[in-house]
Amino acid sequence: MEDYTKIEKIGEGTYGVVYKGRHKTTGQVVTMKKIRLESEEEGVPSTAIREISLLKELRHPNIVSLQDVLMQDSRLYLIFEFLSMDLKKYLDSIPPGQYMDSSLVKSYLYQILQGIVFCHSRRVLHRDLKPQNLLIDDKGTIKLADFGLARAFGIPIRVYTHEVVTLWYRSPEVLLGSARYSTPVDIWSIGTIFAELATKKPLFHGDSEIDQLFRIFRALGTPNNEVWPEVESLQDYKNTFPKWKPGSLASHVKNLDENGLDLLSKMLIYDPAKRISGKMALNHPYFNDLDNQIKKM
C-alpha cells in the first residue's frame, strides 16, 4: 500500500469503501476498493485471492482493468483504473423530457456486449451487472467494472452500509433459485440495462424478490414448462403464482425501433438456453448502422 495515497472517499461499493487514489511514483490516478469481508478475523480466504489474481488477466478496452491486488492489515485492496462517471449518474444527469441519443444507446450496448463476450469466452461471469458498475469516460467509451468479484466474494444481500443490493437487473433463473446458471444471467441483466438506456427508467424495479418476479411476469407473462422447460421444478417456483399473459415490450420501452425491440426481446427470453448469446447479439441487425470505429474497438 505504500505505493499509493488516498485522495478522497468516492463511495460505498458492494464490498466496502471506494477511494480515489494516486500512485506515488507514476502519479497515475486509480480507484482503490477496500474489500470488507464477513469474517474479518480469518483474513482473506485463499480462494478469493486466487479468483482475484485471475482477474488481472482480463484486459479489454471495455473492461475496467484490475491493476493491483494488495494486502494491508489483513484487508484486501483492489486497485483499478480510474473513471469518474458511472452510467447511473449519467442517466440521472439527463434533463427531464430528454433522452440519450439513440446512436449513443447503440454504441454503449455494443461495447457492453463486447466486454461481456470477452469475459464469457474466458469463462468469467459477472452476475451483478447494473448501471452503477458500468463506467464511462468522456470519449464515448463504456467499461464493465467489478467483473468476477461475485464469484470471489459472493453477492451479499445487503451492502455493508445496510443498503439492499438491487434486484432490478437479476435474471429470473437466479430469482427462482436455480442452482445451476451460466452466461445467460449476464445477458438478461444487459437486456434490462438496454431498456433503461432508452427510457432512463429501470424496466423492472421490484423492492423484494417476489415483487421483482411479479413485475417481470406482468410484462412478459408468467412462465411455465411450455415456454421454459423445467421452470416449474425450480426451488422458488410456486404453482400458486398468478398466471399473467404476456404483454408487449413496446408498451414498456417507447424509444426503441423495431430492430431494437427485437434484440431486447431476445435478451429477455425466459429459457436461458434460448436466450440470445452475447456473440449472436453483436451480429443482430440493430447494429448494422453502427459506426465501424466502435466495431473495431
UniProtKB/Swiss-Prot annotation:
Designated name of the protein: Cyclin-dependent kinase 1
Signal peptide: none
Organism: Pongo abelii
Keyword Nucleotide-binding: yes
UniProt xrefs under InterPro entries: CDK, Kinase-like_dom_sf, Prot_kinase_dom, Ser/Thr_kinase_AS
Modified residues (Phosphoserine): 39, 178, 248
Family indicated by similarity: Belongs to the protein kinase superfamily. CMGC Ser/Thr protein kinase family. CDC2/CDKX subfamily.
UniProt GO cellular component terms: centrosome; mitochondrion; mitotic spindle; nucleus
EC number assigned by the record: 2.7.11.22, 2.7.11.23
Positions bearing Phosphothreonine: 14, 141, 161, 222
List of residues that carry Phosphotyrosine: 4, 15, 19, 77
Organism lineage string: Eukaryota, Metazoa, Chordata, Craniata, Vertebrata
Domain Protein kinase: 4-287
